């Protein structure tokens, strides 16, 4: 069964953010990527400290701030592709991921130590209105270009997840979901719906 990874976006969350994180942590998600891209590093550091009080540390992936991860003892990090290329201190992390938008990016990421990649955007998303999705064939091509796990990102919900069944690649590891889980009242129900559709 494919995995579901939650990607956070505090502005989309209408409820108490820490309560939402706790519910996501308690759900059948594999990881939570704490992606708050409008935060300064100090704001982000403070947020992570609070999140660690409600979230399973093994599920938490820090986004974009390696020094914060090291200071707080979080061993998983996800970096935008540009930051991934500049990373010093790969040995500080047990899990390193990056975002790719082409097969060339994917190959570079694998050759330079990424443990997994997110590939997208697969479908049109709420946060990038008007940006056409790259589609299922793009995802299949990315999977074929590398051996590491690949997660689809962009416009994923139970309906679009149905279309991903046809990817049919061993290293297709699952999906990353943002808007849906940030706004959902029934987080685990949504997660399980997506997992059922992915098969």
Question: What is each model feature region?
Answer:
Residues 1-18, 94-100:
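Active-site mouth loops of central-metabolism enzymes
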């Amino acid at each position: 069964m494919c995995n579901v990874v939650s990607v956070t976006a505090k502005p989309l969350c209408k409820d108490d953010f820490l309560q939402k994180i706790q519910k996501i942590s308690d759900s059948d998600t594999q990881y939570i990527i704490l992606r708050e891209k409008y935060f300064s590093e100090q704001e982000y550091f403070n947020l992570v400290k609070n999140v660690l009080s409600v979230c399973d540390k093994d599920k938490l992936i820090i986004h974009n701030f390696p020094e914060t991860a090291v200071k707080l003892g979080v061993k998983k990090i996800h970096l935008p592709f540009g930051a991934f290329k500049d990373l010093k201190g790969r040995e500080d992390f047990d899990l390193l991921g990056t975002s790719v938008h082409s097969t060339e990016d994917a190959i570079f990421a694998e050759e330079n130590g990424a443990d997994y990649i997110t590939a997208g955007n697969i479908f049109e998303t709420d946060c990038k209105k008007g940006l056409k999705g790259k589609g299922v064939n793009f995802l299949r091509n990315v999977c074929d270009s590398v051996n590491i796990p690949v997660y689809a990102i962009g416009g994923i919900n139970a309906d679009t997840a149905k279309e991903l069944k046809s990817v049919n690649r061993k290293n297709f590891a699952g999906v990353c979901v943002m808007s849906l889980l940030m706004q959902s009242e029934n987080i685990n129900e949504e997660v399980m719906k997506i997992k059922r559709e992915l098969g």
